[in-house]
Amino acid sequence: MQESAEEFLKQLKKDLHRYIDAFKEKTRDFKVGHIEDIDKFFDEYLGKLFDSKTDQRIFDSIKNLRFLEQHHVDGCKAILDRISLLEQMPKNAVVAEIGVDRGRFAERIYEVTQPQKLHLIDIFQFDYQLNSVNSILGKKENIEIHQVNSVEAGNVFDDEYFDWIYIDTDHTYETTKAELNSFADKIKPGGFISGHDYFQVGISNGFSYGVMSAVHEFVAINNWKLYAVTLEPLENQSFVIQKPDNQK
């Protein structure tokens, strides 16, 4: 697995260099000013993107991708997008969104699924986030806001409390793994954990997404099922995993 990961990184670097070189060549055709600045930017960007620490971070993130076996994904649904996903989630349910930001997706959860109770969990690092949530959802019924760390929030609720939750926080392997473990017992048997950014390697600023690794590892270790994935071509995908009916 380590060899395949290293080969993947080598190919990724090669492809990026090829595309960037092509871009540089195209910019010269249009007499773009400060072409030396463009060259400097890409050279510095690639230097930061592919240092040894980034290589290791990406490898650590993808090393668990083969945890799953076929029985974990049998019957998995492909769903067009995450709004269509909401249409298939349980209605009149006890729900949480973990990672609310300004509340736009929470508003869609509320409108589409008509929850019995909707818990909105976020540290709300900036005032504008909480102000936006209050503006959009503050007058809605059956909504409770929790300004708390996503992992620690699991301690707030009783076991088997939620029908389903949706996670959209910092997308790292470590945080996602901790969130899944924190909320696993809080989900009713047969209930769901869903979340955003279900892919693996993001190259923005050398940042490695680890949601897929964390989800696959959790499913395999706890014998859950990968219930559904979304297929957005221009937006990050979502996942749904299901807790076994006989698991407390």
Please place each PLM-identified region on the residue numbering.
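S-adenosylmethionine/decaboxylated-SAM
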Residues: F67-K77, R82-K248
